[in-house]
């Protein structure tokens, strides 16, 4: 696993009314600070949103509906996992929070129609000077297709 990337298992609290899942708390060891929360939805499966990286911003990703394949590439030259590539699948069926530190390129592909992701960022998005560098989805030689197993 890329250094500082975390996959946190979340525990649904279930009773006769339904369920509640705590996604992120200020007291969590993987929380740094709050900037903003936004919802991203993909209407059709196989929609790819990749790649970008931040210099300062931390991301916390939670799939609230459907499932997604995430690709992560460590671009931090001083990291012991520099250039390492990780693939992770996050799904509503096994609630998890994906923690992505600055300096790690990341992207995702929806695996189901109407996949929805709640994304929390440590910084407020600055439209005039965004903390992001974007590269094409086929960068790093990454293969987005789903392999038959």
Residue spans for each PLM region:
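Non-catalytic, conserved peripheral segments adjacent to functional cores
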Residues: 1-94, 112-149
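Short beta-strand His + acidic residue motifs that chelate non-heme Fe in jelly-roll/DSBH
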Residues: 98, 106-111
